[in-house]
Amino acid sequence: TSQLKKEFELEDALNNIGKDITLSCCVHKIRTMGKISFVVVRTGRYTLQTVYSEDNCKDSIKWLKEGFFVNITGTVTENEKGINGIEIILKEIKLISAVGYEYPLHVSNKKLGCTLDVNLNNRSVSLRNPYERAIFKLQEGVCNGFREFMLKENFTEIHSPKIVAQGAEGGANIFHLD
């Protein structure tokens, strides 16, 4: 039987400085500077910087592109210039899933800089951008804070049906036949 992996937490890396860790992640950005490359990766909630050099990693990264999902293994090192104060020195990188098409927008840019139509038509991709995702993190924090306060005051949380002007789910009665 296969075991479900727990989601990566930043503490997993911070508690393993000098040790090797393996994690599944998405390639966010690749910056090559001479013989080394900085591969910024995203996990469910975190962005981490990895450092690739041919001396340390047995795998080439010439095939690697933004959006690819990979398993990486590397040594966690402290570096105040690294994202979250750490870097992972890559030892191994294996492809899980490649992107089948060119993204219509670049999620590694600070701001997407695209029209609202392009953003909404590609929402599953645009939400990979930290700036686009921040509004939902803010909303999550406000809702959790409000919920915790109300529960401490002995209120009951109720999930009521929503009343809307039109049929929310649709149905045969919305379609007219001539």
What are these regions (language model features)?
Residues 1-178:
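Class II aminoacyl-tRNA synthetase catalytic cores and aaRS-like
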